[in-house]
Structures are given as C-alpha cells and as structure tokens.
C-alpha cells in the first residue's frame, strides 16, 4: 500500500517557480522526492546554482532529487555523438548533486520512418553504447516509453525486452500512467509479461477532457483523479497489489494547474494524494 512518503513532484508542475521555491513547495507538502528538468525555458537544470547549493537546498528541505528529465531521442544512432555528449553533461550534473538517475526519452517524430524492428534494434544499439557512461558516473538510466503515435518506443514490455537483451543492470523503466493509457499495453499484458522489478519510477497524471485517446496531449495532463479517463488510480492499484513500493512522481503539464497560486496548488496536490490513498 502506498502512502505520502512514496510521492514526489516533477518540476513541470510549477515551471515558473525558481528552484528554491520548488524545493520549498515539496517540503511544505511533506513529500520526499523531486525531479529536475533540463527543458524549462530560462531555468536550466539548477537555475545556475552550484552543485553544493543544490545539495544544501535538498538537505534543508529533506528531499531526494530522484531524477533529471531528460536525455531526448536516446534511441537514434544517427545522433550518437551528440547524444553521448549530452549524456555526459547530464551525468556530470547528476553526480554532482547526488541525483541517482537520468530519464531517457525515445525519438518522437512524424519524420521517423524506421520500421518497428529497426526502432527496436536501434534502441538496443544505443542502450549498449550509453551503458559505459552510466557505469563511469554510477548513474542509472530510466527509459520512458511514450504512447504517442509518432513515438519510436511505446511499450514497457518492448523496453523490458531491450533492457534484457542489453544485459546491463543500470537500466530501469519509467511507467507513465498517461503514456500507458494511450499506448499499446494494457493491465492484462502487464500481469502476464511485465517484470515489476524493472520499474524505476512511476510518472502520474490524469486527463479529464472530452476527447478521444488519440487526441490526448501533454497539455491535457492534470491531477484530477476523481474524473480521470486514464484510470491512473487503477494503474497504481496494480502496482500496489504487486508489491511496488517505489517513487510516484506527479508530472502534469496542464497550464491552468501550472498557473495556480501556491496555496491553490498545494490544495490540489493534497486533494490528489487524498484521492489516491488508500488505493481501494
């Protein structure tokens, strides 16, 4: 069974906050984990604070920085040198701030004309190529399948197969409730094929708009789990019933949530946790 100690915040929930205020928000909510990002305009991963300043902030607020989001297009061998250089940079930052993992996002483009077989083979090739960097920095790689139609890796089962083929223990999977709902897997398939031990983190959000699944976009992701069409609570129930006791990080992109004042945002997050615990 999950409790508040399992939950964390991805910085996308309040991208306008400076990093000190983001840490403070998580602390005031009595959460244990935060995820940083490298894609927030004008912010950088650490808002130009030094590694020592970031570590001090984390300690003061009783927080673990659990990941940096993300190394993009990690499974595109045509960009091998660029991807390796970016991973080295991310790994240097992660190691300096005591962050144990980097999220790996697959190529997601309508101009990707590789076959599914080629995309899988390239995923394996790149995971093998990048493993030495993760080993050197003692950082883990969390692979995040994306459910969008333009994605090159959409299934946690496929990601699991790639990890096993590579044979490197430093890789785990990001289970994202949004991408699971719009992707090819279902809970029955997970029950039969998925290895729960390969889950590194769960990304959690909800969708309430009246659209078809194919029309869902990141901007629709909120934390209203009462009216959630993703059925994220049911997805979490599956993990709870299979002894997952790891990190669950809120990752909503909805602008109306991001623009709430601090008091309203805290109320929404507390309400979301209340609606999810206990998971019945």
Specify the residue positions occupied by each region the protein language model found:
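Active-site acidic/histidine proton-transfer and metal-coordination neighborhood
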Residues: 20-23, 60, 76-172, 268
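A short acidic, helix-capping loop that chelates divalent metal ions and anchors anionic groups
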Residues: 40-42, 73-78, 110-115, 183, ...
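Residue-level recognition of alpha-helix initiation/capping sites
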Residues: 16-17, 48-49, 84-85, 125, ...
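Glycine-rich, proline-tolerant flexible connector loops at the mouths of alpha/beta enzymes
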Residues: 35-58, 107-112
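Conserved beta-strand positions in the central sheet of alpha/beta enzyme cores
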Residues: 35, 67, 103, 142, ...
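Active-site-proximal loop/turn and secondary-structure-junction residues that shape catalytic pockets
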Residues: 13-15, 38-40, 71-74, 106-110, ...
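Short hydrophobic interaction/assembly module
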Residues: 51-80
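Histidine-acidic metal/acid-base catalytic patches
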Residues: 1-8, 16, 20-30, 55, ...
């Amino acid at each position: 069974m999950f409790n508040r100690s399992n939950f964390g915040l991805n910085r996308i929930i309040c991208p306008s906050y400076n990093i000190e205020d983001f840490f403070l928000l998580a602390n005031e909510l009595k959460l244990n984990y935060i995820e940083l990002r490298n894609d927030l305009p004008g912010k950088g991963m650490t808002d130009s604070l030094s590694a020592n300043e970031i570590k001090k902030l984390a300690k003061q607020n009783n927080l673990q920085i659990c990941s940096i989001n993300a190394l993009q297009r990690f499974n595109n061998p045509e960009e091998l040198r660029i991807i390796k250089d970016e991973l080295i940079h991310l790994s240097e930052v992660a190691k300096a701030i005591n962050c144990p993992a980097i999220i790996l996002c697959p190529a997601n483009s309508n101009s990707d004309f590789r076959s599914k077989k080629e995309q899988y083979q390239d995923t394996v090739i790149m995971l093998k190529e990048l493993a030495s960097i993760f080993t050197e920095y003692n950082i883990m790689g969390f692979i995040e399948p994306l459910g969008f139609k333009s994605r090159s890796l959409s299934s946690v089962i496929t990601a699991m197969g790639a990890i096993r083929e590579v044979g490197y223990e430093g890789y785990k999977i990001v289970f994202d409730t949004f991408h699971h709902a719009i992707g090819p897997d279902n809970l029955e398939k997970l029950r039969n094929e998925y290895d729960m031990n390969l889950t590194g983190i769960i990304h959690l959000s909800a969708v309430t708009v009246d659209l078809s699944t194919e029309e869902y976009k990141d901007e629709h992701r909120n934390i209203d789990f009462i009216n959630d069409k993703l059925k994220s609570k049911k997805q979490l129930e599956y993990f709870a019933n299979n002894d997952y006791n790891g990190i669950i990080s809120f990752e909503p992109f909805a602008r109306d949530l991001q623009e709430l004042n601090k008091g309203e945002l805290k109320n929404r997050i507390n309400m979301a946790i209340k609606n999810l615990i206990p998971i019945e």
